[in-house]
Amino acid sequence: MLMDGKELARDIKVKIKAEIDNIKKIHNINPMVATILVGDDPASQVYLNSQVKSYQDLGIGVQKYFFSEEISEAYLLNLIDKLNKDTEVDGIMINLPLPPQINATKVLNSIKLIKDVDGFKAENLGLLFQNNEGFTSPSTPAGIMALIEKYNIDLEGKDVVVVGSSNIVGKPIAALILNSRGTVTICNIYTKNLAEKTKNADILISAVGKAKLITEDMVKEGAVVIDVGINRVNGKLEGDVDFENVQKKASHITPVPGGVGALTVAMLLSNILKSFKANRGII
C-alpha cells in the first residue's frame, strides 16, 4: 500500500488554517514567524520557498532575514535575542546548514524554548527523550509518526530499524518510536552488514541521502518501508529506497516525492500554531 503524504499534509493544513482563522476571529491576531537563511544553499532556499507559500496560504505572518555567508555568529545571536524578546514573534526558524564560522548548536540553543518551532534546541530534544508532554517534535520525525498513525501501524513490540543517525531525523524518530513501545536499532554509515539489520525490520526507515541505498534483498516480506531520503539524480528526485523493486515486498511504502517530504512543512506549521498559542496565552 502506498502511504500518501500529500493527502495527509492537505488535511493537516486545513485543520491548522481553520484554527488560525478562529483565533483571528476571536482575538484579532495572527501567528508571526521569523525565518533566517544564511548563505545560498539551494536545498535550503527550496525549503524556505515552500515554507513561505504555506505561511501565506494559512494566514501566518513572516519576517524574512537573509544574510550572506560572511555574517558573524555574534550578529546572528544578537538578532535571535531581539526576536526572543519580541512578544509578537511566535516562532523562530533557522534554515540549516549554517556556515562553518557559526556554531549551529549554540545558535539553535539560543532560541527561546516556546519559540523553537523546529524542535532542535537541546532542551526540547531532552523533553522528547523523556517523553515529556512539553516537547516540540522536529518536523520530519513528526511527519513520519503522523503517517504511521494514519495507516494504523502499531509500533508496540515491533522491530524498527532506522538507517541514519542525524540529530534532525534519525535520533528524534528513534526516541518517538521508543516512546510508542517499539524496539529500535539505529544504523549509520559505519554499520557493518547493514542488510542483516534491515532484513529483520518490521518497519524500516531510511534517512541517509543516498539514492537506492535500500534494495529489495535488504527488506523483509511485508515490511513497512518509510523513505526520508531526498536525492536529485539526473534532474529527478529519488529516495534512499529502490522504490520500483522494494514496493513488491513491502506491505506499506512511502513514495519520493509525495511521502514524508510532503509532511515536513505541514508539521512545521503545526509547531508554529502550538508556539503561537503558547506565546499568546491562548488555550
Swiss-Prot record:
Disulfide bonds: none annotated. NADP(+) binds at G164, S165, S166, I189, I230. It comes from the Bacteria. Transmembrane segments: none annotated. Gene3D superfamilies: Leucine Dehydrogenase, chain A, domain 1 (3.40.50.10860), NAD(P)-binding Rossmann-like Domain (3.40.50.720). Its EC number is 1.5.1.5, 3.5.4.9. Signal peptide: none annotated. Keywords: Amino-acid biosynthesis, Histidine biosynthesis, Hydrolase, Methionine biosynthesis, Multifunctional enzyme, NADP, One-carbon metabolism, Oxidoreductase, Purine biosynthesis. One of its GO terms (biological process) is purine nucleotide biosynthetic process. SUPFAM superfamilies: Aminoacid dehydrogenase-like, N-terminal domain (SSF53223), NAD(P)-binding Rossmann-fold domains (SSF51735). It catalyses: (6R)-5,10-methylene-5,6,7,8-tetrahydrofolate + NADP(+) = (6R)-5,10-methenyltetrahydrofolate + NADPH; (6R)-5,10-methenyltetrahydrofolate + H2O = (6R)-10-formyltetrahydrofolate + H(+). Pathway: One-carbon metabolism; tetrahydrofolate interconversion. GO terms for molecular function: methenyltetrahydrofolate cyclohydrolase activity; methylenetetrahydrofolate dehydrogenase (NADP+) activity. InterPro entries: Aminoacid_DH-like_N_sf, NAD(P)-bd_dom_sf, THF_DH/CycHdrlase, THF_DH/CycHdrlase_cat_dom, THF_DH/CycHdrlase_NAD-bd_dom. One of its GO terms (cellular component) is cytosol. Homodimer. Belongs to the tetrahydrofolate dehydrogenase/cyclohydrolase family. Catalyzes the oxidation of 5,10-methylenetetrahydrofolate to 5,10-methenyltetrahydrofolate and then the hydrolysis of 5,10-methenyltetrahydrofolate to 10-formyltetrahydrofolate. PANTHER family: C-1-TETRAHYDROFOLATE SYNTHASE, CYTOPLASMIC, C-1-TETRAHYDROFOLATE SYNTHASE, CYTOPLASMIC-RELATED. This is Bifunctional protein FolD. It comes from Fusobacterium nucleatum subsp. nucleatum (strain ATCC 25586 / DSM 15643 / BCRC 10681 / CIP 101130 / JCM 8532 / KCTC 2640 / LMG 13131 / VPI 4355). The lineage of its organism: Bacteria, Fusobacteriati, Fusobacteriota, Fusobacteriia, Fusobacteriales. The gene is folD.
